[in-house]
């Protein structure tokens, strides 16, 4: 009974796209400059945590630690007060890359479950690297995005 309720909550949460959690708006309604400005301001930690919570893979792989570069314990300690914790612009850009990638992979593979499966296992196009492991680097993010584009358009080498 509890699992069914939890799944229903997750389904309701997943109705929002990952980038919508961070931007607090539909990214299609924002100009690229506005997205840049919001990222430069820094996303709120709570919004990043909410975005990560919709993904079993992102939760299991401790993506928040990858984004902020701090241990889970340090993050918890900093988040305890009543103050709003904001990520730096660099951390926010990395969070946005993870959100964008999950959206793109979901679009390409049709479901978030299939997208997460692909993101979490070695990829031949990435010379055996796991897509999730290379996303926090801007060049790695672009390589994974290019790979998804090739899959989407049926271009394999």
Whereabouts are the PLM-identified features?
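Non-transmembrane "mature" sequence context
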Residues: 1-157
């Amino acid at each position: 009974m509890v699992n069914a309720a939890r799944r229903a909550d997750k389904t309701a949460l997943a109705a929002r796209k990952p980038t919508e959690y961070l931007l607090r708006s539909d990214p299609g309604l924002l100009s690229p400059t506005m997205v840049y400005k919001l990222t430069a301001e820094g996303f709120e930690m709570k919004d990043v945590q909410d975005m990560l919570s919709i993904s079993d893979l992102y939760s299991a792989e401790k993506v928040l630690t990858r984004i902020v570069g701090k241990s889970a314990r340090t993050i918890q300690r900093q988040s305890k007060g009543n103050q709003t914790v904001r990520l730096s612009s660099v951390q926010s850009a990395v969070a946005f890359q993870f959100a964008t990638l999950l959206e793109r992979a979901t679009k390409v593979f049709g479901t978030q479950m299939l997208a997460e499966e692909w993101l979490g296992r070695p990829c031949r196009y990435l010379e055996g690297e796991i897509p999730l492991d290379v996303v926090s680097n801007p060049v790695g993010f672009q390589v994974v995005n290019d790979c998804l584009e090739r899959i989407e358009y049926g271009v394999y080498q």
